Amino acid sequence: MFEATTILGYRGEMGGKKFALIGGDGQVTLGNCVVKANATKIRSLYHNQVLSGFAGSTADAFSLFDMFERILESKKGDLFKSVVDFSKEWRKDKYLRRLEAMMIVLNLDHIFILSGTGDVLEAEDNKIAAIGSGGNYALSAARALDHFAHLEPRKLVEESLKIAGDLCIYTNTNIKILEL
């Protein structure tokens, strides 16, 4: 099974302007071997109004992306309503309950983690969320940099993912970032 990655979502306001970014590394691991170093695990959805990223089984993640994107379209881009309906649908479907993937979805106002059990978790501060094998490293770095360093949002995401890549053997520093 393909696994291991780090995805970091970051949203907030700087200088009176809202921002939302998502970043991820490019490493794909199969067992104890790196099989790809430049994979893309982040996407822009609904006319570039929502960002998303996944960690876990690649095939499962694409199933989740497709399902979430369909619901997001039906809710006309309303992220909050979409994650609630996504969770309801996920829990009803026996196949989906076995998927081994997690997602972060965010826009300028909200950031959520969608877990492999169908749970929807809003980030504690509605600002920073991370998933994957290096997620805790990236989350810790992002919180510290957000609190003390006062970096531009893109630089904060990049530096946090670099720290995760230096610490987690399943995460590299081939970083891709999308922003709204």
Curated annotation (Swiss-Prot):
> What Enzyme Commission number(s) appear in the record?
3.4.25.2
Q: Main localisation, per the record?
A: cytoplasm
Q: How is its activity regulated?
A: Allosterically activated by HslU binding.
**Hydrolase keyword on record:** yes
Instruction: Give UniProt keywords alphabetically.
Output: Allosteric enzyme, Cytoplasm, Hydrolase, Metal-binding, Protease, Sodium, Stress response, Threonine protease
Tell me, what's a Pfam family for it? Proteasome
Question: Where is the protein situated, by its record's location annotation?
Answer: Cytoplasm
Annotated binding of Na(+), by residue: G165, C168, T171
A single GO molecular function term of this UniProt record: threonine-type endopeptidase activity
Q: What domain of life?
A: Bacteria
For this protein, what reaction is catalysed? ATP-dependent cleavage of peptide bonds with broad specificity
- Active-site residue list: T5
Which residues span the membrane? none
Query: Which BP terms does GO give this entry?
Result: proteolysis involved in protein catabolic process
A GO cellular-component term linked to this record: proteasome core complex
Q: What PANTHER family would the database entry show?
A: ATP-DEPENDENT PROTEASE SUBUNIT HSLV (PTHR32194:SF0), METALLOPROTEASE TLDD (PTHR32194)
> How does the record describe its quaternary structure?
A double ring-shaped homohexamer of HslV is capped on each side by a ring-shaped HslU homohexamer. The assembly of the HslU/HslV complex is dependent on binding of ATP.
Query: What is the role of the protein in this entry?
Result: Protease subunit of a proteasome-like degradation complex believed to be a general protein degrading machinery.
What does the similarity note say? Belongs to the peptidase T1B family. HslV subfamily.
Q: What is this protein called?
A: ATP-dependent protease subunit HslV
Q: Which organism is it from?
A: Helicobacter pylori (strain HPAG1)
Q: What is the lineage of its organism?
A: Bacteria, Pseudomonadati, Campylobacterota, Epsilonproteobacteria, Campylobacterales
